[in-house]
């Protein structure tokens, strides 16, 4: 029997995650039946569950994948950029990502077992945000009168608010200036320090 290359396995896993993202976004966790997952991924249940133990593991892997992508953006450009990407028309699968994010939030609220499993995986976004903020503070770009943990919590709260706003279908056309304000709120303002009395 021929061996399957790691590249092939990785591509198949990506195909499953991409299809599952669409399926979970459209139907929610409960509505994403095995049959619907097969249709969305264009693969058999055997192929899907060769890579993932069960539907719960698939959903967790998908949510973790989204969180890792966000953490990568945060590390390079900050959490506000993640929010800007959500608003950008050209962002990859924004509605599907949003659906997954909302389903994670719902399950965190209603499913204690999921909450426990997710807690182990969800720290990466918070960690990436705090590291980015610390680097910005060391570079002199971040306000120093508020603790980094508080600033990270503020930014995460704004992200959750933006996700809710988009989920409700509210207009997002004019939110760029709002994100500018959020960004300015965490930056260090040197103008006051540089003004010398006459």
Where is each model-derived feature located?
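Basic, helix-initiating cap at the start of DNA-binding domains
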Residues: 1-27, 31-43, 56-57
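Key DNA-contact positions within bacterial/archaeal DNA-binding proteins
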Residues: 46
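Alpha-helical DNA-contacting segments of helix-turn-helix folds
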Residues: 52, 60-66
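Hydrophobic alpha-helical connector segments
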Residues: 61, 71-99, 148-155
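Amphipathic alpha-helical segments used for helix-helix packing
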Residues: 92-117, 164
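Hydrophobic/aromatic-rich alpha-helical bundle segments in the mid-to-C-terminal region
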Residues: 115-119, 123, 137-185, 189-198
